[in-house]
């Protein structure tokens, strides 16, 4: 029983580490996108935003992806492009 608990704790720690790495990657990408947008002229920003939004509209998610997840992604992309972090 102790071995099972130890094994589960180890797996949990590994998952937590993977989660931290993913959060760091997402935050790094947010910083990069924000910096890129800030260094673009307003008309270039708008053109890029329209292209990204248009590309998202044309994408049909796999049937196994829940609608909620798809909508969450769309909202996050919109927030990142239209309201970048400061």
UniProtKB/Swiss-Prot annotation:
Q: Which organism is it from?
A: Salmonella typhimurium (strain LT2 / SGSC1412 / ATCC 700720)
Q: Which Pfam families match?
A: Anti-adapt_IraP
Here the disulfide bonds are: none
Per the annotation, which location comes first and is thus the protein's main one? cytoplasm
Concerning its family, UniProt says:
Belongs to the IraP family.
* GO cellular component term, pick one: cytoplasm
GO terms (BP aspect): cellular response to starvation
NCBIfam families with a match to the protein in the record: PRK10244.1
Note the HAMAP family from the entry. Anti_adapt_IraP
Ordered alphabetically, the record's keywords are: Coiled coil, Cytoplasm, Stress response
Subunit composition? Interacts with RssB.
Q: Which domain of life is it from?
A: Bacteria
Q: Which residues form a coiled coil?
A: 1-36
State what protein this is by name: Anti-adapter protein IraP
Compartments, record wording: Cytoplasm
UniProt function note: Inhibits RpoS proteolysis by regulating RssB activity, thereby increasing the stability of the sigma stress factor RpoS especially during phosphate and magnesium starvation, but also in stationary phase and during nitrogen starvation. Its effect on RpoS stability is due to its interaction with RssB, which probably blocks the interaction of RssB with RpoS, and the consequent delivery of the RssB-RpoS complex to the ClpXP protein degradation pathway.
Induction and repression of expression? By phosphate starvation and limiting magnesium, via the transcriptional regulator PhoP and the alarmone ppGpp.
The reply to whether Cytoplasm figures as a keyword in the UniProt entry is yes
List, alphabetically, the InterPro entries matched. Answer: SigmaS_Anti-adapt_IraP (IPR019732)
């Amino acid at each position: 029983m102790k071995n099972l608990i130890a094994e589960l704790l180890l797996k949990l720690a590994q998952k937590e580490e993977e989660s931290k790495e993913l959060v760091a990657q997402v935050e790094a990408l947010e910083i990069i996108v924000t910096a890129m947008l800030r260094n673009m002229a307003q008309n270039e920003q708008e053109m890029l935003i329209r292209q990204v939004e248009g590309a998202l509209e044309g994408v049909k998610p796999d049937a196994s992806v829940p609608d909620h997840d798809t909508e969450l992604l769309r909202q996050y992309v919109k927030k990142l492009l239209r309201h970048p972090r400061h």
